Amino acid sequence: MSAYNALNDVPCTLNAWLLTKVLREDWGFKGYVVSDCGGPSLLVNAHKYVKTKEAAATLSIKAGLDLECGDDVFDGPLFSAYRQYMGTKAEIDSAAYRVLRARMQLGLFDSGEKNPYTKISPAVIGSAKHQEVALNAAR
């Protein structure tokens, strides 16, 4: 997840150095990056970093943001930006690919009997061992 704040005067939602150079290239992250809820809209309304939601959508995608929490910018404004040649199909496809790949790996497109995660009972998920792991991760 990106963040609401800025790093080195660049909002994290569209910070290519952070999302692509550090996260993907240096650290080898292969997953997808989702914004904080409403984060791309804040590029216009709060950060005043860009003037339009189309610019927010385009620059976020180019920087390595794959999914918006909410649908204020990656819905109509992204499509509008694409029609105005502000972004490329390849950039949008890369973001969509990363999101869909993760969902496929989680079995979200499989039927219930093929998805191993549907067989994990709440008793296992909430077990003392798992609670201990979660507590240690939070520390």
Name the predicted role of every residue range.
Residues 1-139:
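Glycoside hydrolase catalytic-domain context in secreted enzymes
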